Structure formats: structure tokens, C-alpha cells
Amino acid sequence: HMKLAVSATMIALAILAGCAPKAAAPGDAPAAAPDTAQPATDALQQAIGSDLRSPAEKARDVWRHPKETLDFFGVKPDQTVIEIWPGGGWYTNILAPWLASGGGKLVLAVFDPAAAPDDERRARTETLNEEFKANYADPKFGTLEYTVFSSVSGPLVAPGSADAILTFRNIHNWMAGGYEQKFFNDAFAALKPGGVLGVVEHRLPSTGTQDPSASSGYVHEDYVKALAANAGFEFDGESEINANPDDTADHPYGVWTLPPVSRQPGEDEIPPDGWDPAKYQAIGESDRMTLKFIKPAE
């Protein structure tokens, strides 16, 4: 329950800080030899099934497909991986023990106190970051490293030092702040040549109109691809593993109408026409794009 509480607080803080006004293919690399591939897969399954994850987190695997997603991105347990804005740590709880077991390294880019608009919110961001780090003090998570990402942050890590950079359901937050291109530029600089950028994001159908600040939480796939191309990335493929054809991406409270947030009308609010919470529970979690980009080899 602690993790869930921290997650909710971080989202609330992000709203206050103006970070998130509304919230929370085949590669060219040769296949690993069977004797090395199998233990890596087993170790990932072990991390996914581990008691470091809460039952509530595991219940979302059916929507978030962590094994298939990480396999698609081609992440290996001996790599240096950066997770950008880990939020409540849903993916961190899988990545940290898995990379620890394989001799890899996980770097977490958390909220940036320097981007907070005032001293009070800066202090609150610092406190949240300390609470987040305290959650990962258990040696089972390995030795984690920390950096920050924001509209004003410097390099994520030493240039050209990361094998993979991952971010899950965050692009809309950076669009809201107007610094989405900076994310792709910073990721490009941090990756080794041949390194992978893996993005999962709520998908707005191409027929829908893209709000530049993504106030619904949904984003056009073509826009994400353009941001990556602008930064120098090659598009390497996409997967439909996190798709949900039942999601029309057109809901009264945007993506937050759906689980896991399942936003409800406020006490003094007149519910939207035909409001039926059961309908949104039945849809499930959002339709998501899963995109893989590569930093070209030099």
C-alpha cells in the first residue's frame, strides 16, 4: 500500500509542479545463443513473479504485458538501462531485480526539484524523491543510480553510456509542459550508438485531433515518431501487445476515465451525459502504442 500511496502523491506533486497538469520489430542484432537466452528469460519471469511486487501491481500485467514489452524492446539483463519518470515504480519493481540478477545497471530519472516553481514544491519534490529511494533500499533491487529529467535538466548520464532508455505513459506529461522534444534529444545523447529507446504511450487514433498539450493524455503515434526522428533516431518497429481495441480514446475525463485511475465526477459536479462507470471498467486500461527506436551506429 505504501507504493500506491507514494504513486498517488507523486502524481499530485507533478500536478502542483506543473509537470503533469492532468494526472499520472525486428532489430539487426544477432539472436542470443540459446544457453544465454533461456536464463535471462527465466530471470525476467522470476522478477515479474517476485514478492517485491504487490498483488495490485501483478493484476495489471494483463494490461501492461511487461515480459512481452521488454522482450520487444530487446532489453538484456546485463545492460545499462535508464527509466525516465518511474512514477510509483511499477516497472522499476521488475527492472531493478532483473538487472541486478544479470549484472546490469538501472538508472532512474526522477522528478527534478530544480524545475519546481517555488520553494515549497521544490522541498516536496525532494521529499518524494527521498521516499522513492527509501523504497528501493532493499539489496534485492540492486544498486540503483539516480538522475533527473525536466524542462531544465542537464544530461541524463554521461553521453553515449546507456544501452536502453525506457519510458512508459509519460510523453503527454512533457507535451503539457512543452518540452517533449527535449526528452528525445536528451535520450539520443545518453544512448550508445545502436542503443534502444522504448516508448509506451496512450494512443490517440489518427482520426482524432491532437491537442498540442495532450490534455486527454492520448497522443498521436505519428507525432511520437516525428519527435524521435527530429532527434536523430531510426524507427525500428512497433508492437500491438499493449493495444486495446475497445478504447475509443474519447472519454469525459480523458485517459484518466479508465482504470487504473477511474476518475469519477466530483461531489459538486453534474455527471457527464450518460455517465456509467461500469462502461469504463469494461473497457479496461487504455489503448497504447509500443514503439522501438534505435540510435544509428556511428
Predicted segment positions?
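C-terminal motif of bacterial Sec signal peptides marking the signal peptidase cleavage site
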Residues: 15-18
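C-terminal lobe and adjacent flexible extensions of AdoMet/dcAdoMet transferase-like proteins
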Residues: 273-298
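A short acidic, Gly/Pro-enriched loop at the edge of an enzyme's catalytic core
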Residues: 154-165
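Conserved class I S-adenosyl-L-methionine
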Residues: 77-87
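A short, conserved alpha-helix within the catalytic core of class I
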Residues: 149-152, 173-186
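A short glycine-rich, Lys/Arg-flanked "PGG" loop and its adjoining helix->strand segment in the class I
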Residues: 96-100, 180-193
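Conserved beta-strand signature within the Rossmann-like core of class I S-adenosyl-L-methionine
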Residues: 106-109, 194-202
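Bacterial signal peptide processing site
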Residues: 20-22
